[in-house]
Swiss-Prot record:
Record EC number: 1.97.1.12
Record organism: Staurastrum punctulatum
Protein name (record): Photosystem I P700 chlorophyll a apoprotein A1
Gene (UniProt): psaA
Keywords: 4Fe-4S, Chlorophyll, Chloroplast, Chromophore, Electron transport, Iron, Iron-sulfur, Magnesium, Membrane, Metal-binding, Oxidoreductase, Photosynthesis, Photosystem I, Plastid, Thylakoid, Transmembrane, Transmembrane helix, Transport
Subunit (UniProt): The PsaA/B heterodimer binds the P700 chlorophyll special pair and subsequent electron acceptors. PSI consists of a core antenna complex that captures photons, and an electron transfer chain that converts photonic excitation into a charge separation. The eukaryotic PSI reaction center is composed of at least 11 subunits.
Compartments, as annotated in UniProt: Plastid, Chloroplast thylakoid membrane
The protein's enzyme class: oxidoreductase
Any single GO BP term: photosynthesis
One GO term describing the cellular component: photosystem I
Cofactor annotation comment: P700 is a chlorophyll a/chlorophyll a' dimer, A0 is one or more chlorophyll a, A1 is one or both phylloquinones and FX is a shared 4Fe-4S iron-sulfur center.
Family (UniProt): Belongs to the PsaA/PsaB family.
HAMAP family: PSI_PsaA (MF_00458)
Chain's role: PsaA and PsaB bind P700, the primary electron donor of photosystem I (PSI), as well as the electron acceptors A0, A1 and FX. PSI is a plastocyanin-ferredoxin oxidoreductase, converting photonic excitation into a charge separation, which transfers an electron from the donor P700 chlorophyll pair to the spectroscopically characterized acceptors A0, A1, FX, FA and FB in turn. Oxidized P700 is reduced on the lumenal side of the thylakoid membrane by plastocyanin.
Length: 749
């Protein structure tokens, strides 16, 4: 950290009225492009319109103008999110059984959608308990509302209205900061100020505000609900906030006010700031006093972090200095030049953020079941499965997006003159070694992981179970994972002496937690089957990374096409007369990476779904625990045939037999999504010329009848066809999985 003489204060950097508001301009499709603004001559126009509408790089090369468009679009995105959230809360207020669910969250299922009887589809309104007919939802919103202290539908209405007000504010802000007071480029590039405000403001004060809400509103309300007090008898939130005596009745330290805080006698507050670990046995969720403690600690950390970077006062860190000082003995110029990349290429910035955000989303997926944060979330198996699946899919898409934008950065924004012998340059220069080694790793993982499975299938087929890899024959125990589990399970009383229980029940060493006769969470034993599946995970993830990384590292040039950078981010082939140069653009690598991402995530969510049904989820009685699939994972998941027979086929019976029941929509979606998936193959396995010939024949027939269209029909380009193909492939696959999972888990869970 360096202290300098104070630098001149940062001036307010905006341009006033830079772009006039014009409805005439907005009403003209393609107004952002000279070519598109002329209007359509062929059907390709509508595809190009969609491809380029948000590709601000193609509208202008002025970085300031691009930055303003992105900034303004973010406000539009926030407005959409607020409207969507408002709709969720409105459904909770108007069409849901939330108040009934609050009274008996174990036996009544959450529902916030009632189907109107138009052509007999009111069959979809299943009996969710508590005298309510509707569609069972698996979003986890009821549990979140309960955890935040919402007890009435009026509160949900009010929040929904608040969401619409915020949406209006965001729409106004998007217009204002583009048309009235648009920030200058220097403002977008002022990273220290941005870090300070985002860290201290968004994350720090955001967490502090949430901790405050949890202490003064959520905690007393949840405490009373847990004790069995009727929601209608509980004081309203503002009464707890304004009347300290109400809180002091539940938490005696409130009577002392802020005295313990200023006298540093903080232990006084340990009645509502705890470090217990484990789960609340009443709700099956994390202890609310633990999560309050967590948010308070996070707030302190981030508020401190938000004072670390040098702005007007000449004190603190400079990102440029930190990066340029970051040199090792083996890495040349180290991070020199990276500051310039991240302040002039928003694609590079976005790639980094997407990679981190995607990884974080997958980490969230794993914590949502192992440390369920909301009351009664853990016993709502449909919601648990949905949340895990959702967060892993989101993570997968974000990580592929990171590969896409990293490649776009290299094609459009990379400046070789400023990148000499720094880390990026060095990685690009030994890309052949990186990719060939990664390729070897993929081959090794692929042959060995599938080799173990094929060995097992062969032995099983030959009737030699004693020669299989399984927990009852040749064991391949995941010893490192078991060591990690045991270390965490032993931490309370050993390396974490102040914790009452381990961070998660899943580590083992403790009893399972059951709520209302349903298992909330139990230790998760790992065995040979998990070892085998784990190596399939390693294989699919490494292949996804291989495809994306090859696309990035060879985005500008390769031995095959040395001038690739001149062809752009997406191109079908390197022109006529150069056979074997198709499917080499950076875009094609993203296209191929998406399929492997789909492979990766599918295996992950199948593993999770079956493992939980087999070893965790179930009911508790005097005779012990009865799991949904009776612990069949350890034997079934050791062969490919077992996955097909004992998981896919055995668990598809609910969705296949759903006709005539309230789950029949899932049966239709299962069928329809299979069709959407199959439809994608028509685009993926077909050549452009085939369709062009067909179109010309059809156009000839129209000309004969004198009904020829003014806009000339054209076949999709190769890239457009692939984009349509991969979109339907993923959409069909995801919707099929969704219907399969939900029909199954709502039936048996």
């Amino acid at each position: 950290m360096t202290i300098r003489s104070p630098e001149p204060e940062v001036k307010i950097v905006v341009d006033n009225d830079p772009v006039k508001t014009s409805f005439e301009k907005w009403a003209k499709p393609g107004h952002f492009s000279r070519a598109l603004a002329k209007g359509p001559s062929t059907t390709t126009w509508i595809w190009d319109l969609h491809a380029d509408a948000h590709d601000f790089d193609s509208h202008t090369s002025d970085l300031e103008e691009i930055s303003r468009k992105v900034f303004s679009a973010h406000f539009g995105q926030l407005a959409v999110i607020f409207i969507w959230l408002s709709g969720m809360y409105f459904h909770g207020a108007r069409f849901s059984n939330y108040e009934a669910w609050l009274s008996d969250p174990v036996n009544i299922k959450p529902s916030a959608q009632v189907v109107w009887p138009i052509v007999g589809q009111e069959i979809l309104n299943g009996d969710v308990g508590g005298g309510f007919q509707g569609i069972q939802i698996t979003s986890g919103l009821f549990e979140m509302w309960r955890g935040s202290g919402i007890t009435t539908e009026l509160q949900l209405y009010s929040t929904a209205i608040g969401g619409l007000v915020m949406a209006a504010l965001m729409l106004f802000a998007g217009w204002f900061h583009y048309h009235k007071a648009a920030p200058k480029l220097a403002w977008f590039q002022n990273v220290e100020s941005m870090l300070n405000h985002h860290l201290a403001g968004l994350l720090g004060l955001g967490s502090l505000g949430w901790a405050g809400h949890q202490v003064h509103v959520s905690l007393p309300i949840n405490q009373l609900l847990d004790a069995g007090v009727d929601a209608k008898e509980i004081p309203l939130p503002h009464e707890f906030i304004l009347n300290r005596d109400l809180l002091a009745q539940l938490y005696p330290s409130f009577a002392k006010g802020l005295t313990p805080f200023f006298t540093l006698n903080w232990a006084e507050y340990s009645d509502f700031l705890t470090f217990r670990g484990g789960l609340n046995p009443v709700t099956g969720g994390l202890w609310l006093t633990d999560t309050i403690h967590h948010h308070l600690a996070i707030a302190v950390l981030f508020i401190v972090a938000g004072h670390m970077y040098r702005t007007n006062w000449g004190i603190g860190h400079s990102m440029k200095e930190i990066l340029e000082a970051h040199k090792g003995p083996l890495t040349g110029e180290g991070h020199k030049g990276l500051y310039e990349i991240f302040t002039t290429s928003w694609h590079a910035q976005l790639a980094l953020n997407l990679a981190l955000m995607g990884s974080l989303s997958i980490i969230v997926a794993h914590h949502m079941y192992s440390m369920p944060p909301y009351p009664y979330l853990a016993t709502d198996y449909g919601t648990q499965l949905s949340l895990f699946t959702h967060h892993t899919w989101i993570g997968g898409f974000c990580i592929v997006g990171a590969g896409a934008h990293a490649a776009i950065y290299l094609v459009r924004d990379y400046d070789p003159t400023t990148q000499y012998n720094n880390l990026l340059d060095r990685v690009l220069r030994h890309r052949d070694a990186i990719i060939s080694h990664l390729n070897w790793v993929c081959i090794f993982l692929g042959f060995h992981s599938f080799g173990l499975y094929i060995h097992n299938d062969t032995m099983s087929a030959l009737g030699r179970p004693q020669d299989m890899f399984s927990d009852t024959a040749i064991q391949l125990q995941p010893v490192f994972a078991q060591w990690v589990q045991n270390t965490h399970a032993a931490a309370p009383g050993f390396s974490a002496p102040n914790a009452a229980a381990a961070t998660s029940i899943t580590w083992g060493g403790s009893e399972l937690v059951a709520v209302g006769g349903k298992v909330a969470m139990s230790p998760i034993p790992l065995g040979t089957a998990d070892f085998l599946v784990h190596h399939i995970h390693a294989f699919t993830i490494h292949v996804t990374v291989l495809i994306l990384l090859k696309g990035v590292l060879f985005a500008r040039s390769s031995r095959l096409i040395p001038d690739k950078a001149n062809l752009g981010f997406r191109f079908p082939c390197d022109g006529p007369g150069r056979g074997g140069t198709c499917q080499v653009s950076a875009w094609d690598h993203v296209f191929l990476g998406l399929f492997w991402m789909y492979n990766s995530i599918s295996v992950v969510i199948f593993h999770f779904s079956w493992k939980m049904q087999s070893d965790v989820w179930g009911t508790v009685s005097q005779n012990g625990v009865s799991h949904i699939t009776g612990g069949n994972f350890a034997q079934g998941a050791t062969t490919i045939n077992g996955w097909l027979r004992d998981f896919l086929w055995a668990q598809a019976s609910q969705v296949i037999q759903s006709y005539g029941s309230s789950l029949s929509a899932y049966g239709l979606v299962f069928l329809g999504a299979h069709f959407v998936w199959a439809f994608s193959l028509m685009f993926l396995f077909s050549g452009r010329g085939y369709w062009q010939e067909l179109i010309e024949s059809i156009v000839w027939a129209h000309n004969k009848l004198k009904v020829a269209p003014a806009i000339q029909p054209r076949a999709l380009s190769i890239i457009q066809g692939r984009a349509v193909g991969v979109a339907h492939y993923l959409l069909g696959g995801i919707a099929t999985t969704w219907a399969f999972f939900l029909a199954r888990i709502i039936s048996v869970g």
